[in-house]
Design a protein with these regions (language model features):
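Bacterial N-terminal signal peptides
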Residues: 15-25
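Bacterial N-terminal signal peptides that target proteins for export
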Residues: 2-15
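Mid-length scaffold segments of soluble, non-membrane domains
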Residues: 76-124
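Short glycine-rich loop/turn motifs that provide flexible caps or phosphate-binding loops at active sites
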Residues: 24, 45-46, 94, 100
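Extended interaction regions within the primary functional domain
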Residues: 8, 79, 173
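Primarily secretory-pathway and cell-envelope proteins
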Residues: 28-73, 123-181
Length: 181
């Protein structure tokens, strides 16, 4: 083989080796990004710090409550994993006591009344509800609101020792009254 051909082969192999080494450490843009993004909201209410971490499902034009989410069946208001509600101090939720701690949040949507459930099972996949782990169940009357495409939890009202935590998806708003103890 002539010296120029050998030099060309060596250069080509060296270039392939360099490209191979550089591509091993590169991050690919083809990584899967979940459609239901993780979100969290935190709020101080009196001496308590409250936080909820959840995955945000998206409506995408679907009929939600009474269709995609059946009435009168346990449902997780989070995708992938159950929402986690934590409080550093005991709370009164809808006038019922919830000890300080971490809880998974579940719901039983109804046409006129919803039940929100705080369970000691944490963390847990969003389809594995067990009523034996219930710590608190509260009944709430849902309200109608502007359309919210992506499920959200937020605090529309906060006072010195009380707050309202809203669960909002589609046109349904479920306001949860909280008082710090």
């Amino acid at each position: 083989m002539p010296p120029l051909c050998i030099l060309a082969v060596v250069k080509r192999r060296a270039a392939l080796i360099v490209v191979g080494i550089l591509s091993v450490g590169c991050k690919t843009d083809a990584q899967i990004i979940p459609k239901s993004q993780v979100a969290s909201v935190g709020q101080n209410v009196g001496p308590a710090h409250i936080e909820i971490i959840y995955h945000r499902p998206v409506a995408r034009g679907r009929d939600l409550f009474g269709a995609l989410v059946p009435y009168d069946r346990v449902w997780s208001p989070s995708a992938d994993t159950a929402a986690i509600f934590s409080t550093t101090r005991p709370l009164d939720i809808e006038k019922s006591q919830l000890p300080a701690g971490k809880y998974s949040v579940w719901a039983i949507p109804g046409k006129d009344t919803w039940t929100l459930i705080f369970s000691s099972a944490v963390p847990v996949f969003h389809l594995r509800y067990r009523d034996a782990s219930d710590v608190l169940r509260v009944k709430i009357t849902p309200q109608s609101g502007d359309h919210m495409e992506t499920l959200g939890f937020y605090f529309p009202m906060v006072d010195a020792d009380s707050a309202v935590l809203a669960l909002h998806w589609g046109k349904t708003v479920v306001p949860l009254k909280i008082r710090a103890r």
